[in-house]
Amino acid sequence: MSKSLKRVTRALTEAGLDCLIQEIGHATTAQMAADLVGCEIDQIAKSIIFAGSDTGTAILFITAGGAQVDPACASALAGEPLGKADAALIRTQTGFAIGGVSPVGHLSAPRAYFDRRLLAFDQIWAAAGTPRHVFGAPPGEVLRVSGAELADFTV
């Protein structure tokens, strides 16, 4: 088991969540992940990381799989212009590789925002620390454990 997967598993357990973690193979899109899990695309919780242009810190947006983050809304929420986060920043600040960024278990907890549309489902699926693993949990629990703020930031 990878260090990242162990860290996510530990974070979920410490939060009192008994989640099913599945190895689904390498999915490069939310639609591929949804097809492999057998759920709707919007039940896939994507963890999108931006870099604060002023602070240089990672800022996490947890969004429904079929949605796109609106850069203007995201910047307004963050209170600073946002830019693309490169692989080095993501790995250094979250501890995850691109494609495996989980909403929980970060090395350093980023500011995080949670897409309201995820609350429409009984269960959502999110990366579990690797591009090949996901965990399923009620969206309210993912919101709680992630420490994210509920917000509107998608188009």
Please provide the spans of the model-predicted regions:
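Extended, low-hydrophobicity, polar/charged segments
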Residues: 1-155
